[in-house]
Amino acid sequence: MKVCIISILGRPNVGKSSLLNKIIKYDLAIVSNVPQTTRDQIMGVYTEDGYQFVFVDTPGIHKPLNLLGESLNKEAFSSLKDIDCVLFLSPVNEDIKSGDKLILERITNAKNKIAVISKIDLAKSPDEIAKKIDGLKEYGFNKIISVSNKNDKSVDSLIEILKEYAYNAPPFYDEDYITDKSMRFMAKEYIRESAINLLTDELPHSIAVEVQDFIEEDDRITINAIIYVKKDSQKGILIGKGASMIKKIGTNARMKMSHQFDTKVTLNLKVKVSNKWINDKSALKKFGYN
């Protein structure tokens, strides 16, 4: 077996989670158009044709405005320990920004690093892709490639390139192993994903989810969870008129869990206010953001 441990880095909302899901062919990392959707370091394992790649998806690196932001950056940079290759993602339609430069400084001495130009379906012309490639050349990447999550061939090309950095070693995990995250963790994330994709403005950044009970039975899983917000006004928005919004959130999350877990799911949601959770160390620890 040939193996390689790969860290996926980039600013918020550059396509890291979408790429991981496409590679491992499983909705592991939640996806939305809201920056900083990923809050945890998530490991996804690809095993095929005598190769095993362990991918580490990270929170988007940004200038932190609170303790949660500091925790997310710390989580992202911790992924650089004991890795064999770095994938640095940057969208084709965006210039290199201060957040990118922060990451590029941290990976200056990485032995193997690949620049991945993401969202190439948004490119207006081949010249735009060429300009992006030129802008990345000064940072010492081993390779610069472009990827579209809508194009399987471009993802296959990335896998072929990564094989160049794999080495002979016993596999880290069994062939059917996908992630180190538990079903309980995934339930929390699917609830948060459902809420994020239905809510607007700053509210998605203000929510946290706690799974209180995760009960596995022969024919179903029963989940009791709490969605926390920072303000009473946000609680009203999250619940909605006649509980319409919380019902939508619950229905969407339950349907995804039932599909991903391959069993019936009963989901019970409550909404509570925790005014300062985003800047409270004990609250962050409670929600899994150490």
Curated annotation (Swiss-Prot):
SUPFAM superfamilies tied to this protein: P-loop containing nucleoside triphosphate hydrolases, Prokaryotic type KH domain (KH-domain type II)
Location of the region described as G5 in the Swiss-Prot/TrEMBL record: 147-149
Binding, GTP: 10-17, 57-61, 118-121
Subcellular location: Cytoplasm; Cell membrane
Keywords linked to the UniProt accession: Cell membrane, Cytoplasm, GTP-binding, Membrane, Nucleotide-binding, Ribosome biogenesis, RNA-binding, rRNA-binding
G1 as annotated region, ranges: 10-17
Segments of this protein annotated with the region G4: 118-121
Boundaries of every KH type-2 domain copy: 199-275
Subunit architecture: Monomer.
Official protein name in the record: GTPase Era
Origin species: Mycoplasmopsis agalactiae (strain NCTC 10123 / CIP 59.7 / PG2) (Mycoplasma agalactiae)
Lineage: Bacteria, Bacillati, Mycoplasmatota, Mycoplasmoidales, Metamycoplasmataceae
